[in-house]
Amino acid sequence: MLTLGKKALSVPILQGGMGVGVSLGGLAGAVAACGGMGCISTADAGYREPDFARDPASANHRALTAEIRKAKQIANGAGMVAINAMVATQDYAASIRTAVEAGVDAVVSGAGLPLELPGLVNTMEVAIAPIVSSGRAAKLILRRWAKEFGRTADFVVIEGCKAGGHLGFAEQDLFSGSCQTLDEILPEVLAEVKPYEVQFGHSIPVFVAGGVYTGADLAHFTRLGAAGVQLATRFITTYECDASQGYKDVLLNAGSEDVRIIHSPVGMPGRALNTPLVQAMAEGRRFPPRHCARCLKTCDPAKVPYCITHALIEAVKGNLEEGLFFCGANVGRLDRMYTVRELMDELVTEWRQNR
């Protein structure tokens, strides 16, 4: 068993949060039921609610509570149910408080430095974890948490440059291929967490993500000192994934040559499929938002090239023309549908064979 805060995992596998609506209670609960950590994305979790357009905040909080409870019911006491909360979102603090009240087991936070996270999670019963892309980021966050809140991380997630969605790397490094590898970042982060393990008297497990695809990858990184791994894209082609079958089919039909690095309205680079929307952005076209859900802290509707909320909602519905389909670098390896249990069993078997 791998202890993370007050809870434990029987399998050292985290499912990465995917918004909008890709990882909700169905997927997260199924992963947790297998002994891993399932993760619900807080990003517009209420996009299907009837009042979402009129009152997105209320819709999102109501849906987030329902999805956490759904996941916990499916898990039936196994594994852990987490949320992924993006620092860049307008509703960041409120969504975390909602999740804590709903009984979530852990809060994982990235898309910016989650410097204030311990102050938003007012109980030690809920584990907290930053997502980092360098030892420097881990050092900055852990130092701030210890000094300002007298608390440290219960675990840390390293997201490497091959991850899908928003990326914590400079665009020029992503385009040139000069980003640090996970093999290089992992020892840096392990060195940074060590003093805080001593100070707070407990281990701080480190998980790696971004390009992780097989149980052999899990074995490789655990040999290097990681506690486990996080996968996201591989979980999209599970039957339990909360996205539409149309969304899953788009990824199943994609090849590695279809992947692009984009600049997101969030203000960060991201990895996504080269869909008609992405092609239009590359041509300098603009699609002014028809309605603003006030999802991002930094978004200016008068200037933004497109509405990321609209694009991600259209994607999760399977709309290839208007959707933004985030994906990891290994999306071209997806070739079939499977259950979460089948995927988890495959990963664990490969891990045991290779460790």
Which residues does each PLM region occupy?
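Conserved active-site-proximal phosphate/metal-binding subdomains
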Residues: 14, 163-207, 213-355
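Residue-level detector of alpha-helix initiation sites
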Residues: 22, 212-213
